[in-house]
UniProtKB/Swiss-Prot annotation:
Catalyzed reactions: 2 Fe(II)-[cytochrome] + nitrate + 2 H(+) = 2 Fe(III)-[cytochrome] + nitrite + H2O
Family per similarity comment: Belongs to the prokaryotic molybdopterin-containing oxidoreductase family. NasA/NapA/NarB subfamily.
Location of this chain's protein in the cell: Periplasm
Binding site for substrate: 797
Cofactor(s) required for function per UniProt: [4Fe-4S] cluster; Mo-bis(molybdopterin guanine dinucleotide)
Protein name: Periplasmic nitrate reductase
One Pfam entry name: Molybdopterin
Amino acid sequence: MTLSRRDFIKQTAVAATASVAGVTLPAGAANFVTDSEVTKLKWSKAPCRFCGTGCGVTVAVRDNKVVATNGDPQAEVNKGLNCVKGYFLSKIMYGQDRLTKPLLRMKNGQYDKNGEFAPVTWERAFDEMERQFKRVLKEKGPTAVGMFGSGQWTVWEGYAASKLYKAGFRSNNIDPNARHCMASAVQGFMRTFGMDEPMGCYDDFEAADAFVLWGSNMAEMHPILWTRITDRRLSHPKTRVAVLSTFTHRSFDLADIPVIFKPQTDLAMMNYIAHYIIKNNKVNKDFVNKHTVFKEGVTNIGYGLRPDHPLQKAAKNAADPGASRPITFDDFARFVAKYDADTVSKLSGVPKDKLDQLAELYADTNIKVMSLWTMGFNQHTRGSWANNMVYNLHLLTGKIATPGNSPFSLTGQPSACGTAREVGTFSHRLPADMVVTNPKHREEAERIWKLPPGTIPDKPGYHAVLQNRMLKDGKLNAYWVQVNNNMQAAANLMEEGLPGYRNPANFIVVSDAYPTVTALAADLILPSAMWVEKEGAYGNAERRTQFWHQLVDAPGEARSDLWQLMEFSKRFKVEDVWPADLIAKKPEYRGKTLFDVLYRNGQVDKFPLKEVNAEYHNAEAKAFGFYVQKGLFEEYATFGRGHGHDLAPFDAYHEARGLRWPVVNGKETRWRYREGSDPYVKAGTGYQFYGNPDGKAVIFALPYEPPAESPDKEYPYWLVTGRVLEHWHSGSMTRRVPELYRAFPNAVVFMHPEDAKAMGLRRGVEVEVVSRRGSMRSRLETRGRDAPPRGLVFVPWFDASQLINKVTLDATCPISLQTDFKKCAVKIVKV
C-alpha cells in the first residue's frame, strides 16, 4: 500500500479538516506512511468497534499484534476521520486484565455457586455448562433456558446464536442488549412503514437545509456524523440546526434553535408541530392522499412494570398496547388541535416563539429537513410513540425518502442494525423482519433451516427486562450472556438484576474479554476473542454491511463467541432437546447433534477451507473444517433476498467498503421507498411503502402521557443517565485505554450551580444519589460540558465503580419493551 502525491495532499486536507472540526487524529493519519517495506506493518480495513456510525478504519498489524489504527480515507462514512475513541482502537484489546482462560466458581475442586473463580479447561467449562443446561431442560423444559446477546455480535455470531436457541433449544428466550437502545426505533419503523431501518442514508447530511436533534447529543455520541453536520452548517449559511434536550450539552454549541424541555413533553411538542403544519395549510396533500393512512393508537397502556405494580394495575390497555383503529385526516387534525401553542408551552416549558421556529423548519416547503434521534426518544416509556410521531411530521409534509429529507434513527452499537435487528436476535423476531408469532414466517424459517414443522415456538420469549425478572423469580435457570455488561447496564439492578444472577437455582455463563461487573456476578466466565481477533461483519445505521478479516490471534485460550456457540452445540443430541413427535417428522435426525442439524446441514458447511483468503487467519474455519462465516452468511441472506432486504454475495463485502441494502444486481440502495432509487418501487408510483400490504405509511394520532415517575417533595430531582465522548457504554473497553481513562476517569453528578448552592453543596464534594430503589455515591460537578436546568441531574453510566443503575427505574415502553433510562425521581444527599 503506497501513498501517491494526490493521496498525500488528500490526507493532509483530511487532517486539517479534522482539526477545524475538533476531531483528534493520530499522528499516523497526518503523516500517512503506509509502505509495508518501510514500516513492516500489514494494513487491512475494518469497521470501527464502537458506535453504530460504522466508520471505516485501517488496522496495522506487526508480530501478531494490532499496533496502530487510522481513519480509512476510502471509507464513505468517515472519509479518513476518527473520533477520540477511534484514535485508540489499537489499545482496546490489550488491557492488563484481559481474560485468557475459562473461570468456574469452585470449592474443593467442584463447581459451587458460592465458590471462588478458578481457571479450568474449555472441556471442563463445557462439561459444567452441558450438565446444567441438560438438567434445566429435563426438569423444566425450553422456557427455562435463555440468552442475552448483543448489538456487538458479528452478523454470523448473532445468527448462529438465534438458530441455536430458537431452533436447537426451541426457546425464544434470546434477546440482545439492543432491547435497551433500539427496540423503540424498531417498533416505530414497523408500525409506520411495516419494515425496519431508515429509508435515508448519510448522504442526506450534505443535502439537508435543517437538522433537528430530538434527544441526541451527536457532538459526543456520533462525533463523525456531527462533523458532517458542522461542515454543512458552516459552509451553507442558511442551514439551521435545532437541538432539543432536557439539559444543555456540547451539541448546543452549534444550535441556532436551542430548546430545553421538561422530560416526556417531546410528545406534546411533536403534536403541536403537526397542528402547526395543518393550521398553516402546509400539508403536502397530494403525498398524504396517495401514500398515507391515518390511525389512532390506544392510550393508557401502562409502563411495562411488574403486573402487581399500581401503575400497571391501573393501565386499561396494557394487554394490547400496540392496538389502533383507522381514522380520517379530519379526525387527526382535531386530535392534534388540542395541542395548541399555549398548552404545549406551559406543559413543556418551551417559549412559544421557539415552538414556532421549530415547527417552521418542517412546515416550510423550501426547507429540506433531517430529524435525528437516539436514546432521548428510544429510552422512553412512550418511545414507540415518539418514533411514530416524528414520522408524522415528515409524512404530513412529504419530506421523506429524498436527498436531505430524512427522519433518521441513529444507532449506538456497531451492529444493532446488522445483527440484532436484521438477523432477528430479539425474542420475538426472525431474520428479515419476520416474527415468531406469524405461522408463515415460522414455516419459512423452518424450511430454510431444514427443521421439522413446528420446531420454532409460536410465542415471544422473555425480553431483556423480563429475563432479569424471571431469573429472580426462578423461572429462567440456565442463562448465557455474550458481549454485553447487563449488570452495569440494566435498570434497577439491585432489586431486579443481581438477585437473579445469584439465585441458587440458576446457572449463569458470561462470555467476555474482560472481568466486567456482569462477569463477576456469573458462575462461569468464558474468555472471548475481540474485534479483529476474528473474521466479522457489522451493519451500521444507514443499512451498510461491512466485513473484516481476522488480523491477529486472540490471546491465550480466548475463543470467539461464534466458536463457543457452535462448539457447545456439539454437546446436545436432538433427543436431548426435542420431543419424540418432532423427531418423528425428521427421522433422519435421530442420533445427530445440534451441530450436525444446525451448522453441518449442507448449507452452512457448503464452502470449503480453500475459499478462505490465504493471507489471513480464520480460527473458526480452521476449527470446524469449512468456511463457516461464509456458510452462515449465505444461509442467512436467503431470508431477505427478493423481499426488500437483499444482501450482496459474501465475497463482495470483503472487497467493498460496505454496501447499503437492498443490494440488487450489485447495486446498493441509498433512498428506500422512492421511485428511481429503490428497485422495489414500481415505475409510476412515485413512492411505495411496501412493508405495508397497501403500500402506504401510517400517520398515528397519539397523545402526551406522563412518565412513570416524576419528582416530588421527597425525591425532588429528575435523574437522566447517558454517555460521554471519551467512553463507550459501560466503559469495559475504553476505561482500559490509559489516555481515555485519564481524560474522564470517573463519573460525576452534573447539577445546576444554583441547586447546589441552595443545598449548601460545592463542586467536588461527595454526594449520594438516592431513589426509591437504591443509591450510589459520586462527586458533584457544577461546571463543564453538561449543564442541567434546575431540578435535574445528569449522571453518565460508564463507571463500574459508580453503578447509577442501582437507582434507575425499570419502566419500559409497553410496545417496544425498551427501558426508560432518562426519567426517574431522586434526591441528592451530602455524604
